[in-house]
């Protein structure tokens, strides 16, 4: 049985580094000022950001996007100076790039990462560069921060995950359970990722979502895809999510997740019919609609999917960092929430997310799990009993093995187009 340990007990080879011990970290951004609600009254975009319940603190920062060409970065997280080491970098078709990295302790922050380096999802960052802008998710000691453009500036947002919207509408439990052809031949005690697969996703953002975000929406979408792929790598899923296309729509949102998702999915109802032409042209297996509805984080068309139902809607502010983008695609692959939240055993008794809630200390949860009783960070991992975080298995074979579900169904979805 393959067993991997991550976090403080981890030892993983970090790729893409050739950093001398004497190297200097490049400053990614410098603080300008913490923005108060009173000072944001004259700027609607800032006012909306500060009014978002999950926004704890907003700080204007001065960004040097060119710093992401370097293997080490340093910056200040609301008064605390930190340094990060690059694990890999990816080039984007539009000329941009994605920088993946890990935070290091002060004792090794200026040394090259080796096989003894830590690989901790609670101390990691992913940054998308587009021209002079940076859009990224930063987790330090489990706490989520977002770096993003807003108008002609950049802001660092400290996020209070306990105040994020509910994951789904109340009628989530009435979603159809859609049988899928699967490949459930990996044993319960095994951790095989099976044959690699690629799922292509078409992302459509409403104009309302683009306006409300006020940043570079395409970069946010690229960040969502990058985070999803990192989660698949972290959990040994053997799956790559590929951005087939991104476009916007002038569709006027109804204010109801179920209605908007139905209209997105419909091929001849007169609302967003053209996206199905785009789907075919781009050979997208899955479609995701980004909307400006803060009532919930997202909604999938079912637990499991067919080629005609592989659609989901996501509130833009939950898509990254909180991993709702990957979460909803997980539902389309038949993944369910943690067993305490969702006791259904269909289609897989083991197909649930996982929460770790110790009597004392900090807990955590995987991508498909609802929040802990005392609130806990959502880590970019799928439940998997064969992977441990700080010595704690991230699932169990009987009720919490989302990795196995994704491996079962990935080939089916990858063949939708």
From Swiss-Prot:
The keyword Disulfide bond does not apply. InterPro entries: MetalloPept_cat_dom_sf. Its cofactor is Zn(2+). The keyword Zinc applies. It holds the Pfam family Reprolysin_5. PROSITE patterns: ZINC_PROTEASE (PS00142). One of its GO terms (molecular function) is metallopeptidase activity. It comes from the Bacteria. SUPFAM superfamilies: Metalloproteases ('zincins'), catalytic domain. The active site is at residue 328. One of its GO terms (biological process) is proteolysis. Its EC number is 3.4.24.33. Binds 1 zinc ion per subunit. Metalloprotease, specifically cleaves on the N-terminal side of aspartyl, glutamyl and cysteic acid residues. This is Peptidyl-Asp metalloendopeptidase. It comes from Stenotrophomonas maltophilia (strain K279a).
